Amino acid sequence: MEGGSELLFYVNGRKVTEKNVDPETMLLPYLRKKLRLTGTKYGCGGGGCGACTVMISRYNPITKKIRHYPANACLTPICSLYGAAVTTVEGIGSTKTRIHPVQERIAKCHGTQCGFCTPGMVMSLYTLLRNHPEPTLTQLNDALGGNLCRCTGYRPIINACKTFCKTSGCCQSKENGVCCLDQGMNGLPEFEEGNETSLKLFSEEEFLPLDPTQELIFPPELMTMAEKKTQKTRIFGSDRMTWISPVTLKELLEAKVKYPQAPVVMGNTSVGPDMKFKGIFHPVIISPDRIEELSVVNYTDNGLTLGAAVSLAEVKDILANVTRKLPEEKTQMYHALLKHLETLAGPQIRNMASLGGHIVSRHPDSDLNPLLAVGNCTLNLLSKEGRRQIPLNEQFLRKCPSADLKPEEILISVNIPYSRKWEFVSAFRQAQRQQNALAIVNSGMRVCFGKGDGIIRELSIAYGGVGPTTILANNSCQKLIGRPWNEEMLDAACRLILDEVSLPGSAPGGRVEFKRTLIVSFLFKFYLEVSQILKGMDLVHYPSLASKYESALEDLHSRHYWSTLKYQNADLKQLSQDPIGHPIMHLSGIKHATGEAIYCDDMPVVDRELFLTFVTSSRAHAKIVSIDVSAALSLPGVVDILTGEHLPGINTTFGFLTDADQLLSTDEVSCVGQLVCAVIADSEVQARRAAQQVKIVYQDLEPVILTIEEAIQNKSFFEPERKLEYGNVDEAFKMVDQILEGEIHMGGQEHFYMETQSMLVVPKGEDREIDVYVSAQFPKYIQDITASVLKVSANKVMCHVKRVGGAFGGKVTKTGVLAAITAFAANKHGRPVRCILERGEDILITGGRHPYLGKYKAGFMNDGRILALDMEHYNNAGAFLDESLFVIEMGLLKLENAYKFPNLRCRGWACRTNLPSNTALRGFGFPQAGLITEACITEVAAKCGLPPEKVRMINMYKEIDQTPYKQEINTKNLTQCWKECMATSSYTLRKAAVEKFNSENYWKKKGLAMVPLKYPIGLGSVAAGQAAALVHIYLDGSVLVTHGGIEMGQGVHTKMIQVVSRELRMPLSSIHLRGTSTETIPNTNPSGGSVVADLNGLAVKDACQTLLKRLKPIISKNPKGTWKDWAQAAFNESISLSATGYFRGYESNINWETGEGHPFEYFVYGAACSEVEIDCLTGAHKNIRTDIVMDVGYSINPALDVGQIEGAFIQGMGLYTIEELNYSPQGVLYTRGPNQYKIPAICDIPMELHISFLPPSENSNTLYSSKGLGESGIFLGCSVFFAIHDAIRAARQERGLPGPLRLNSPLTPEKIRMACEDKFTKMIPRDEPGSYVPWSVPI
């Protein structure tokens, strides 16, 4: 076999050649480290987030066409790119050349916050426009289906995309985002006239036109190469792996004979993740992506034959074309396949993955294999011995040797037969999220009847996700043949299939009862579908479907989205150049979109740089018997391995580690994921390989405490207990009409910031100085803990933060620990050290939002007034205290939300468990505490027979009132938000419409709920609220401003420049902000608590006013001068042009002994109304509409403020509905990445989203009367939770099920389905508790 070793491809129009290619190298690190194209980001490494999206272009010499498709660079081996052209975000535009319209519009439509996901979003949209310059809304939504954003809530990204939509015959690109295709989705009036957007967030007239003629051309050299008929097999190799890329079938077969165990790889979407995450290594890879015979598309008399190398995206296009051309009776299978292909993975994976690879991988949760198996599909195989054909049946799917591919065989193509008349095929799936999520259970079902007789002649049913392989219910189907298609058959079928497709209680993946229920629920849906079709074909002989059942056949998937925004106009009295109150674009928006914004890991490699990674504990509670690092140290490139013995203890006054005074554990571990060793090597690859070779011997210890209930049982708490009491609770209980007791459990939440924990530590070489470049929220803490570990004073450690790719509270405490260890390694070896956590490590190590258990006892009157409330709050703190006590305290101080409970008592405990310590996360205890209170109110309403909204209103604060901690409060704006939300959401009208819908539909239900919000702003002490700033004026009249706040996406730097512009009456273009550093602003407080702009803005304002006061004589002498004139004059008179600004903090205190104080400066008020629709058979839900009204004071920047509100709302919606952490009974976290842990995607947002601000209100103590909005909106996500609750209540009420209805959070599809009890949930078998070990435990 001839071989060549040179790899040739193009990147952004430039030729790239590599003579010694390592087949293990993926495109992402090659772009970032070798080509220094850092715009393409690492987000997860598994193709699940889209941050690394690039466009790949290939020329097909047969069709003479160029195919452009999006791909995940993290899964693309560079060896697979021979002859391809890669386009990255840098290749389509930059600030140095010209920006592309896609980049411009995403930035100017305010579609970026932290900006880390933005290059991937840009490239997904760009690729779509290369193929479809005037896309439809459906195409846009599909194109972004593989991209995640944790900040924006997607609305502004969608609005940016809509500006490219077709406009002929449609108003899709109107400025308010409202399209004629989308209006009136629920048949109800929208906003009244006069409620339009008060000013535009962006002006489409400014946008650059999209001109396809200006795009990069496909390199002619690659076209010439592809046309050559004398191509050779190419072999690329390294010490560990060989990559073989044959050109002909003959060469492919030769390679397969020589290396029969080598996998055949097309897109690397299956083999790649297995190698990365499961440690499966293949010394030889065969990649036949240039063989024409594997890409055939043949139409025969019997069906369609598709080549094994055809991508899933191409299969989707082919099937869509076929279904348009052929009669429906022939395309039943193709329609079913298309249904799954709409939601299978994201566009990037669908364009990379091949049909053959998907089939042969035989993943147990494959969406296509169950369908192909029931459709009598066959596989065409080839080997040296010749061709043969095998059925794609259960034996093949189970890898039975007699029905499987032989090691030397390859799959050439797949035959998918046409369907026949009286034959019907359907596809079903239910996942945690509608799109880009593996199915919990999926199914393919096919039935064939005798002509017009309704008697089953053939029946085939297959399920995925319910066993180690796809399972066919062949025995059940055989017993049903010959039976008429009626309800008796259905009942028998359910019982037969439940018996045959059995799941043990300990089945991997858990959710056993839910999966059993889906097995029969899907079967019932199939029965309904076929029954309706039969009725349509023969009105006489088949009974009509009950009208209440018809909606069960409709999909819940959201396809189009629209929104309206109503916010404040800038003050008419202010100067026209004054930017305060205007929707100024994010300072880094364009750089986010071009990939030029520099994050920590984008910094160039420093000379002699090392890489550090961690070895973590695999046990929840154990003694460390021994640590053997010898094998790891012997590997090439390994420099050192640190253990706890090398690092000195740190001063425990840092508080966050409590009694663990070691950064690396030496004697005992208290959770899975605890840091044990740090491996330092010359490269990341070498460090990670070495980490896998460290051997740790453990001796397990008891008890292992994972849950709150176990902590309560073992009295495992951190001290002290906190208590808040108001009024006389015990006496009040004697005076009420009714008393109820209940509890609610709320699961935790992963931060899922897009940029993982990142740091680069550089020793300066003298005086033991060291620079720490880090993605962090609390530079001072990093400075202090690093100085403590290095035993130097703080003035030798400088911490620098340019920007952070998302944080949400997760880059405060744990970042300090990671940075201190990295700094110790850098100091020890006198070399720079970089540490970038992989996504799985990050989630495992850093903890997240605290799971909560809330217990309540409420005493109330029959009219809904709650007179007494006694509550207990428990949070799962994890192994170390971290910020858990503060979270409990904030939860207690905020628990009453918008309500006045005249007699209230609440106690709170932080539970010590054997989990990684949980920490701050947006909302800081309020999302949990508030949900407990709202659950109590909902149950009180049910007991009183009243609507929950009425009970909420009855118990709401009156205008002038007092909180439980005796702080005076004026809630006028709370009442106004509630009333306006009621009005703008048409609540009364829609409530009636929801009730009408529910009365007419049995298997689908709608729910409507409205919740108020009172979110206190303040940090509990004056010291925690101090801030400083430094402003320099240069002689050319330009200004440099620095302050202590961290830019995490919330736009604080943008607001600070607006402040300087107003105070100095200077254009924004003259002001610059470089970043945050302990070198310029010492002793900073952490950025969080919604006060970053408040506090630092007041410090910046103070600095500017100091300068103005100092320069007043100069300016008065030359009032018409410029800043350049004034600066030069001041310099000539030896007047300082630099000033520090300082804000000492809001007056804030709380005395826990008395339960009294003034912990908060002000309150943010709001209300949200959400409507949902649920599928009672599957547990799926659709977010139909949300209306939010917020009191924002006076908005400094409406674009940034509305972005914070809607981003927080979507994150909260995820918290309360789909984001679920799964732990093993041994304390191992399963959900360590986007493939297991689902945050909201574009498919999850409300189809309609309406946000409005109250008119401006005055507050002389805050920055221009503004309010901090970073956290408050997250709680409003629970309006979706209670809307689902309302829908479930309606379903249960119709079924005659008794109350009370108590639902835990998150309200996942599993919880929704199992709460909608019916005949199917009753027929499933249930395992006795204690008779099995569950796959996961609820934490």
Swiss-Prot record:
Pfam families (alphabetical): Ald_Xan_dh_C, CO_deh_flav_C, FAD_binding_5, Fer2, Fer2_2, MoCoBD_1, MoCoBD_2
Catalytic site positions: 1271
Keyword Transmembrane helix: no
Post-translational modification as stated in the protein's UniProt record: The N-terminus is blocked.
One Gene Ontology cellular component annotation held by this UniProt entry: cytosol
Cofactor binding notes: Binds 2 [2Fe-2S] clusters per subunit. Binds 1 FAD per subunit.
Residue ranges of domain 2Fe-2S ferredoxin-type in the record: 5-92
Keyword tags: 2Fe-2S, Cytoplasm, FAD, Flavoprotein, Iron, Iron-sulfur, Lipid metabolism, Metal-binding, Molybdenum, Oxidoreductase, Phosphoprotein
Residues reported to bind [2Fe-2S] cluster 1: 44, 49, 52, 74
Catalytic activity, EC: 1.2.3.1, 1.17.3.-
Binding annotation for FAD: 264-271, 345, 354, 358, 367, 411
Gene3D superfamilies linked to this entry: 3.10.20.30, 3.30.465.10, [2Fe-2S]-binding domain, Aldehyde oxidase/xanthine dehydrogenase, a/b hammerhead, Aldehyde oxidase/xanthine dehydrogenase, molybdopterin binding domain, CO dehydrogenase flavoprotein, C-terminal domain, Uridine Diphospho-n-acetylenolpyruvylglucosamine Reductase, domain 2
Compartments it resides in: Cytoplasm
Domain annotation FAD-binding PCMH-type: ranges: 236-421
GO biological process: lipid metabolic process; xenobiotic metabolic process
Record bears the keyword Magnesium: no
Domain of life according to the entry: Eukaryota
Chain positions found as Phosphoserine: 1069
Residue positions binding [2Fe-2S] cluster 2: 114, 117, 149, 151
Family according to the record: Belongs to the xanthine dehydrogenase family.
Complexes and interactors: Homodimer.
Function, as annotated: Oxidase with broad substrate specificity, oxidizing aromatic azaheterocycles, such as N1-methylnicotinamide, N-methylphthalazinium and phthalazine, as well as aldehydes, such as benzaldehyde, retinal, pyridoxal, and vanillin. Plays a key role in the metabolism of xenobiotics and drugs containing aromatic azaheterocyclic substituents. Is probably involved in the regulation of reactive oxygen species homeostasis. May be a prominent source of superoxide generation via the one-electron reduction of molecular oxygen.
Name recorded for this polypeptide: Aldehyde oxidase 1
Organism placement in taxonomy: Eukaryota, Metazoa, Chordata, Craniata, Vertebrata
Gene encoding the protein: AOX1
